[in-house]
């Protein structure tokens, strides 16, 4: 039985061609429909954003995101700079003080010569007030830089939040400020979170990068900073519109001068920040070399055996050796980011207000600590999370949230209690270029309300009685009693 052989190529009939043509058209139509749907979804999303978010809101969001981003980078770079200058803390303190004087001075000079932003009234502001503020900020900066050398980045961020309870206490004493139970509860929770964060240092556990003495040295910086906050509320309460660059220049100038005379404290500090009186000039010279990328403290080996000498750095408990390669690059980038960071603070405060600024500050804290744990960002300076560090972070965030909510509720109640509250109080925010950003506290400055005259009180009394006093009668009363 022979098999019927089929042709390799069977002829196509008209129906097959027509079906294939229809399939191709259908596929093309489906592709077009899919593209139309994708375009319509994207367009609808764009229209939604355009209708729901105004140009002003979008601008505020951009400023807030840039503030948070620059704040995180600023904290990371600061710790990088501290680690580079571990052996030259006093030099680093002078660098972070004097480094801003020419920058702010150039801006102020330009404004005085080519703009009207700094009128004569501003220039006549008492210099002694700048001196006091600069002195307080100098002490704060000194403790921050010296203590921060042996305090890890994540712990620095947590300790910064302790300025809130310190400022609340001093505001209660000097400004007669009263706080709600929610605010007090938030402050107590923050204190609890700080204590939890310090447990590894207190118990001698995993303290890589931390020294208990310098952890508390860093924590002490919150006290003069809290005093500075309160002083600004007192000394600058009469200032209507102080040019921020003018203020920053004189604050940085006096902070630098006062910071220079703080070197005797180093005489009693433990390594690596100890410095005898006769070592001040050599320390400054070695710090300057480190800024230029030249190592002074290097490993010393026995020429015969090749072993590390007991007197060498990196031997046992001796000081670590210098690692100054590219130090000037890190410092320049840090100072540039720090200035931009403070500009974004001003923009957020101006366009969004203190409430949004507080929320952004709260968001910045966990993001910074997370960034410190990434090795691809911090390299050998990274600090992996531990159970206690996570617990401390969560507790402090809970306390910050409580404090912020309590502050907003308190302000709303005060506004509702008095129709004139907006004219009697204001949030006075005086930015300050510090090496790091502390926990933010709203200082309420109470404006002085002028006393009411006798005429005003008489008219108010008659009005409550429903008596309308003729204007001619009022003029006679004014001439007899006079306004006081």
Swiss-Prot record:
GO terms for cellular component: vacuolar membrane. One of its GO terms (molecular function) is xenobiotic transmembrane transporter activity. Residues 79-94, 150-154, 200-210, 266-328, 379-382 are vacuolar. Keywords: Amino-acid transport, Glycoprotein, Membrane, Transmembrane, Transmembrane helix, Transport, Vacuole. The chain crosses the membrane at residues 58-78, 95-115, 129-149, 155-175, 179-199, 211-231, 245-265, 329-349, 356-378, 383-403. Glycans are attached at residues 206, 302. Residues 1-57, 116-128, 176-178, 232-244, 350-355, 404-484 are cytoplasmic. InterPro entries: CRT-like (IPR013936), Transprt_Chloroquine (IPR017258). Nutrient transporter. Involved in maintaining the osmotic homeostasis of the digestive vacuole. PANTHER family: PROTEIN CLT2, CHLOROPLASTIC. This is Crt homolog 2. It comes from Dictyostelium discoideum (Social amoeba).
